[in-house]
Amino acid sequence: MLRNGNEGMSTIPGFSQIQFEGFCRFINQGLAEELEKFPTIKDPDHEIAFQLFAKGYQLLEPSIKERNAVYESLTYSSELYVSARLIFGFDVQKQTISIGNIPIMNSLGTFIINGIYRIVINQILLSPGIYYRSELDHKGISICTGTIISDWGGRLELAIDKKERIWARVSRKQKISILVLLSAMGLNLREILDNVSYPEIFLSFLNAKEKKRIESKEKAILEFYQQFACVGGDLVFSESLCEELQKKFFQQKCELGRVGRRNMNRRLNLDIPQNNTFLLPRDVLAATDHLIGMKFGTGILDDDDMNHLKNKRIRSVADLLQDQFGLALGRLQHAVQKTIRRVFIRQSKPTPQTLVTPTSTSILLITTYETFFGTYPLAQVFDQTNPLTQTVHGRKVSCLGPGGLTGRTASFRSRDIHPSHYGRICPIDTSEGINVGLTGSLAIHARIDHWWGSIESPFYEISEKAKEKKERQVVYLSPNRDEYYMIAAGNSLSLNQGIQEEQVVPARYRQEFLTIAWEQIHVRSIFPFQYFSIGGSLIPFIEHNDANRALMSSNMQRQAVPLSRSEKCIVGTGLERQTALDSRVSVIAEREGKIISSDSHKILLSSSGKTISIPLVAHRRSNKNTCMHQKPRVPRGKSIKKGQILAEGAATVGGELALGKNVLVAYMPWEGYNFEDAVLISERLVYEDIYTSFHIRKYEIQTDTTSQGSAEKITKQIPHLEEHLLRNLDRNGVVRLGSWVETGDILVGKLTPQIASESSYIAEAGLLRAIFGLEVSTSKETSLKLPIGGRGRVIDVKWIQRDPFDIMVRVYILQKREIKVGDKVAGRHGNKGIISKILPRQDMPYLQDGTPVDMVFNPLGVPSRMNVGQIFESSLGLAGDLLKKHYRIAPFDERYEQEASRKLVFSELYEASKQTKNPWVFEPEYPGKSRIFDGRTGDPFEQPVLIGKSYILKLIHQVDEKIHGRSTGPYSLVTQQPVRGRAKQGGQRIGEMEVWALEGFGVAHILQEILTYKSDHLIARQEILNATIWGKRVPNHEDPPESFRVLVRELRSLALELNHFLVSEKNFRVNREDV
């Protein structure tokens, strides 16, 4: 965070900074650290040694541009060169060799892998170290445990049982005596007793059997190995057994790492050097000693809070990429060893480069990274729905992933907000559903200490000198440091009314909220936004909203679709500009100069005697099928300054974020069309393209070689197809640019050869061959057809040919989508709804000046949801629209005076009423409300209605992608019922409760059809088609449906036989014995 020259002013840090800093640390430190660990590969038989050096590695500039990598589905990467040495007998060779390619981060903070933008999000994990806890069992006896967590997530648990014996348990396996563990680690009994504070406790459970186990290190190792590896029988001590134990336990389970060593030293008051990153006998001894102190009352019962951020660490992009680089070097080591053996079989003289150059070896690095980006849960496809999404995605923190929690097993406490989150992790912004509380977002001022992995937050230091001079020094505090400070909240009323010495202010101290005297304050918050993420900081009047609705709002803003005509909000928070700039969707001038020319593809800039061409993005598809487009904003001949906006991206206006539209809304019921969150809209929003958005769909097809060895062919000459379907194809069989295509049209014509046997020829085919010598076509038509709902304009066709038989064709189709019934809209306060009806504008309710309303919301959606911020926003928006003003309001404006929001809104409405000479804008009897008229009758409504200008977004959940119907389709293999889901062409589920509803209406025949013919009655399903075609009566089958037979089989697996038979009029009188 940077200080400005102005007193108390500061700038918000760059929102993508965390990703860039992480990647820079990987390049500058991570690569060197892993290269230092690379061992010297020796072959003693042939006196050969191969070694890589950490110093002087180089990364070349990427060989392709970002755009070309996306266009050609390649990986944007850079070649890594490393110094290597090869000793071959008495010959020493030094050479700088290439060991492969590393993906490079681009200007968005993302990676391009196989043409797809991907991002690595930060993972938050329990920090390595030791954690103590004490809990009462069912008898009320206190059980104390200490858990040592390694850098790789392995656990060593120490516990004292009811008989006051101390046990160790490795990775939740069988428990083992602590004395055996310490002896196996190399300590004898005298050393143990001399270095503990409670030797008598150790001696109390030292019986003859225990003494025998630890009389020598070898016996202790054998005993430990038997328990650890769960091996029975008589073992004999050997070096190989010792090595296996060293590898499986001491190296994997006991590596603390740099962070773990610091935490261990701090918790147990040890002074072991930082470079000693493995668990030592001294650590286990001190941990056991502390545990005894806790159990027997001589120590303090200080349970560690596992959810406190001081006990968590962030694994950023640097750590994850470094781990993969280490993995790739391990594979490289094995590959080089194989190559060395091969060299001696061929009896050729090796060089450092020839050992690494073979194809499989040189691509090890890039394939390791491509596998990582493709399969690792924290390497996600970059969300490009709108500029806000692009900015926010890289600031996510997740507890999920390898070594972390899972959505199904995470406890409520691990999901909850913790006092240490303040100013570091947003208390609002998290996902809904099973992962609630497990994925969060960093607060806007938070930064990551990449050395220790902790999240830091900035505060103003209020020292005695600073109080005298009225200066403010900014300090960044980590979670373990801010416990010792009295922190005044920056959004409290008293801090902004001029501090008197005797005044009492609200503060935080040791995770508690207090009110204390101003003289006792050490630091204070720097900014009202400090506690929130970007999503939360874009909600105006957030302090008047319930947190659940604010959470929904911050998630829904990320789902807003960029509109064809963007508009910035009348009421905002002031963070819109920085969010738009940091998303990098706009083009910013990097130097000053003069515009030579500008069009939709590029801007030519003259600067310092040079002509610079700045390319623009024109109708490019995003990962979410939205349209990315840059519009030039500078005319020819204009002089520009450095930092000026040259072209605006989608959903930005004037350099500010513009996700929605300011529309006139009324809160009133209207004929039940806005019941339960439905929304009534005016046809003006359709005809004037207010909520029209562009979407780009991608369709692709690839040629292959059949099992008989013949290749598929892309062609326009496709027999048995109507000419109408082929009208848009060029002579190569690919759809033309600019064509308008409808559902079912052929986009790419393709034929797949088939081998037909003599017997399969029809009689006519034999005749044609005999008379004319013509071969009958044996190709199958496998063209790419436009699916349902895909109609639009072809804007791009890509032909990618890697060899003569491997051709990929991609067709991009632009769709223009107006708002329609079934689309989802939302405000910025969690007020979401589905369009239920589009009303002619003359039927919409209208204001006293004749203006028809654009949207009608249900007023019952406000009180129970407690998102009153929308009322403030709409009223202030109306005033701003009439006064031609825009407002930027920081949250918690009650810190200036009480009822500040209400006073601002009423004063602006009064001013608007006065200036426009419209008394209905502000009526003192019901301020904010107005009498409005029914558009159908012209009569005024009985009650005054709240009207205003709200900023409403159109979300990506659109009816075109949701609507679905099925006549017949695939069935499940086991139950023979229709499969589930739109993607699989699935059916509509009729569940138990739906059956009850139909039973309530007594519709027996409809119900029987639903449960048998339309579902899982195999024979009836086949015969109903025949009966329908020939107009016969649908037969009533007596055999059971498939689901009943599945039930019978499941009962048989439980050794229960269930038989059934039909009871009819003929066999109704049966004996009980027969049944």
Curated annotation (Swiss-Prot):
Top EC group: transferase
Keywords: Chloroplast, DNA-directed RNA polymerase, Nucleotidyltransferase, Plastid, Transcription, Transferase
Alphabetized SUPFAM superfamilies for the sequence: beta and beta-prime subunits of DNA dependent RNA-polymerase
Localization annotation: Plastid, Chloroplast
One annotated GO molecular function: DNA-directed RNA polymerase activity
Biological-process GO terms, alphabetical: DNA-templated transcription
Catalytic activity: RNA(n) + a ribonucleoside 5'-triphosphate = RNA(n+1) + diphosphate
GO cellular component terms given for this protein: chloroplast; DNA-directed RNA polymerase complex; mitochondrion
Presence of keyword Cell wall biogenesis/degradation: no
Pfam families: RNA_pol_Rpb2_2, RNA_pol_Rpb2_3, RNA_pol_Rpb2_6, RNA_pol_Rpb2_7
Source organism superkingdom: Eukaryota
EC numbers on record: 2.7.7.6
KW tRNA processing (keyword) present: no
Function: DNA-dependent RNA polymerase catalyzes the transcription of DNA into RNA using the four ribonucleoside triphosphates as substrates.
Family: Belongs to the RNA polymerase beta chain family.
Assembly, per entry: In plastids the minimal PEP RNA polymerase catalytic core is composed of four subunits: alpha, beta, beta', and beta''. When a (nuclear-encoded) sigma factor is associated with the core the holoenzyme is formed, which can initiate transcription.
HAMAP family to which the protein is assigned, alphabetical: RNApol_bact_RpoB (MF_01321)
Entry protein name: DNA-directed RNA polymerase subunit beta
